[in-house]
């Protein structure tokens, strides 16, 4: 795939791949040294902390480099002569980002499993955690799309784009800690419309609570868990809206 080859030439792509190995490795070591040294806790960290704080902003930063690449190199006119529609250009770039997101999560899962074997931790729920790793890669890709849409809308303002990425990531991350946001029924509220709080409400039901505090929170929170079909449906609708907006913005951009 041409777009994948373009990504491979980017230094940020290599850096992102390194983080896909390093961050889960460090996180796994911290979990193992803590009180919750089980395979489920390791994967929870990789899916949530690594995904929410690292993967999502990386996807947007990769998008910044990817979507501005043709404009920076003045190759957009040549691409359109071939001909390749702007819609197909956008879709191909987003597919590459989706593949990267899934691979990022699978790499984290693999490192968690390898470290568990090294420290003789039982691989309980291996199949489920592998499926969740793939699913998390998909939903975090969807979570990044609203921010990518904003980045495209602001055109080639790299500094502003980075600021948007920082604010978007931090806002979503903080929100998923707020009980006032995540403990709400499905509806037109932040706990439903903001991607990370929604994803957290879906993911947490697969956690295995340890200790009285976690068990008490799990029981209170369980009333607001979001099923897999509902979570994916909401994110699918948001993704379609974002992609249509991207295509509209990209088509109006001067070459």
Where are these regions (language model features)?
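Cytoplasmic juxtamembrane interface segments
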Residues: 1, 67-80, 147-184
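Aromatic- and glycine-rich beta-strand/loop motifs that create alpha-glucan
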Residues: 1-17
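Residue-level recognition of transmembrane alpha-helices
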Residues: 16-20, 93-94, 165-166, 235
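Secretory targeting signals
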Residues: 21-64, 92-158, 224-228, 232
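Terminal transmembrane helical anchor/hairpin motif
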Residues: 34-42, 162, 166, 170-249
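Helix-loop-helix units of permease transmembrane domains in multi-pass membrane transporters
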Residues: 66-98
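Short cytosolic juxtamembrane segments of multi-pass membrane proteins
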Residues: 249-255
């Amino acid at each position: 795939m041409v777009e994948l080859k373009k990504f491979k030439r980017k230094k940020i792509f290599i850096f992102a791949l390194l983080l896909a190995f390093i961050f889960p490795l460090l996180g796994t070591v911290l979990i193992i040294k803590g009180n919750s040294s089980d395979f489920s806790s390791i994967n929870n960290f990789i899916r949530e902390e690594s995904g929410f704080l690292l993967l999502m902003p990386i996807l947007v930063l990769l998008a910044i480099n990817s979507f501005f690449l043709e404009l920076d190199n003045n190759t957009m006119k040549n691409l359109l002569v071939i001909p390749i529609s702007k819609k197909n250009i956008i879709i191909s770039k987003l597919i590459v980002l989706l593949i990267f997101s899934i691979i990022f999560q699978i790499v984290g899962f693999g490192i968690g499993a390898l470290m568990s074997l090294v420290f003789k931790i039982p691989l309980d729920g291996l199949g489920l955690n592998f499926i969740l790793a793939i699913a998390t890669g998909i939903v975090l890709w969807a979570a990044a799309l609203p921010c990518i849409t904003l980045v495209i809308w602001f055109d080639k303002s790299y500094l502003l784009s980075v600021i948007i990425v920082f604010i978007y990531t931090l806002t979503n991350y903080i929100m998923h800690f707020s009980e006032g946001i995540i403990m709400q029924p499905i509806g037109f509220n932040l706990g439903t419309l903001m991607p990370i709080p929604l994803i957290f409400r879906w993911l947490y039901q697969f956690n295995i609570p340890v200790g009285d505090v976690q068990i008490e929170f799990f029981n209170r929170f369980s009333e607001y868990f979001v099923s897999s079909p509902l979570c994916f449906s909401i994110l699918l609708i948001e993704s379609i809206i974002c992609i249509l907006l991207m295509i509209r913005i990209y088509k109006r951009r001067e070459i």
